[in-house]
Amino acid sequence: MPKTVAYLGPEGTYTDEACYFYAPDEERIPFSSLGLVTSALEEGKVDEAVVPIENSLGGTVIEVVDYLITSEKAHIKGEILLPIDHCLVTRPGVQLSDITVVKSKQEALTQCREFLSTELRFAEQIPTTSTASAVTDLKESDDRTAAIGPRRSAELANLPILIQGIQDRQNNVTRFAVLSSNGDTPDNSDKTSIAFDFDRPDGPGLVFGALSPFADRDINLLKIESRPTGKGMGNYIFILDFEGHIDQPHVKEAIAELTKHTATFKVFGSYPRAQGLAGR
């Protein structure tokens, strides 16, 4: 019996593309918001969920991180690195000179600002709820309208791609997390994601003292960032990614040293590190 995997829909979004790459033969279920995706996982309505957690240009997806901090069920069991390759999609036979309206999600319009300002500088830009819906709506539009969206959305809608790769930055990558209620056994390519805050607001050497146990054990830190806890100015929670699995002895030792100074500590998951970009 195939497992059920929730994702942020509709079909044809970049999250759908990541979910399809991860689970092509499983039952993929779209939801209209990240909140509904995480609720479905939390309530046991699905086995897993694929959610965006970080973008190389836009940074961390705060809603997902906040969910992981508070959830007692969800764990990261895998990750997918998906190149964000924006395509200009049209109705059949449409040329660039015909286009007077461009529709897409606001983030996509912003990420294609240079192309739009040079190639379609007189075209009206209309934001939509998703890149996929912008492409799907072309079926009911006239030949003056184009959409910016993923290749997959164009393929699903059976519409031609006029120009591919119109984003300003070619290194635009979104990291997706695969969430589950179950963890995985150690692998040689594991990474671990954790969150913690300190038992006091600040102090000399506080962050250094928290991170030095990792350096002392040659544990490579992959990412560190902070965000407000909501408990008042100067109170932050730290998000840390590092190489290794939470069950490895040297990682356990580093965590034991770290938690001597923390008020809150949460393991998001230990999981295989993505090996390259999806589909490349």
What is each of the regions a protein language model found here?
Residues 1-280:
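Domain-level signature for soluble enzymes in the chorismate/prephenate branch of the shikimate pathway
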